[in-house]
Amino acid sequence: MIHSKRLRLWLYLVLLAVFISACGMKEDKQIKENFNKTLSLYPTKNLDDFYDKEGFRDQEFEKGDKGTWIVDSEMVVELKDKKMESRSMVLYINRNTRTTKGNFIVRELWEDSKGYAQSKDTKYPVKMEHNRIIPTKPIADDKLRKEIENFKFFVQYGDFKDINDYKDGDISYNPNVPSYSAEYQLSNNDYNVKQLRKRYDIPTKKAPKLLIKGDGDLKGSSIGHKNLEFTFVENKEENIYFTDSINFKPTK
């Protein structure tokens, strides 16, 4: 009798483990499929193409609203005993008016003598015409103006055609938020890492980890967000990382 109860308990635990494993595999598959939809946008070399790209639509969109694509790329560098500085650009690609506006942003963060966090943001308004970034206000600094005019978003040169070859990925899912992510250790020979090093002065030889993360319904949501993060260094004294996002939202 005792042996029979133990056998039933053992079978129950085995079935429970199989069920949990199957659910986990299903979630992993859904997460990868969800990310692949976003990653398929890379590369979109001509940003004007977003005027004709349809994104996920739900009840948050008003009737007749074609939506707005929001693209954002940012490089952040914080070295030991130095200010954290980030340089980024965000564009709002309005499919209704077929016009694009945004900002190039230089941000500095530091601690004052009392240990309080301080920050300073400097924004330079821009527009996009025929895949060209154009400052909408005069910029006296020629070097800065050229940096803005020559800026390229990661979506214009990033490529994830080999994403399925990435190994040892750490897939996680939190149904309570809900949020989900996939993390991979990359090498310096990775195509996207080479492209980032080509375009930015990245003061480390360490290969980055790639974190792809999102929140909202796995089946799709205009409320949720997705973004990529290449983290080269992350500790209490230094931080070096690059982030990129492409999101489709109702037009405001």
Swiss-Prot record:
This is Uncharacterized lipoprotein SAS2375. Keywords: Cell membrane, Lipoprotein, Membrane, Palmitate, Signal. GO terms for cellular component: plasma membrane. Residues 1-22 form the signal peptide. It comes from Staphylococcus aureus (strain MSSA476). Gene3D superfamilies: 2.50.20.40. A lipid is attached at residue 23 (N-palmitoyl cysteine). The keyword Transcription regulation does not apply. The keyword Membrane applies. PROSITE patterns: PROKAR_LIPOPROTEIN. Belongs to the staphylococcal tandem lipoprotein family. A lipid is attached at residue 23 (S-diacylglycerol cysteine). It comes from the Bacteria. InterPro entries: Csa (IPR007595), Csa_sf (IPR038641). Its main location: membrane. It is found in: Cell membrane. It is a lipid-anchor.
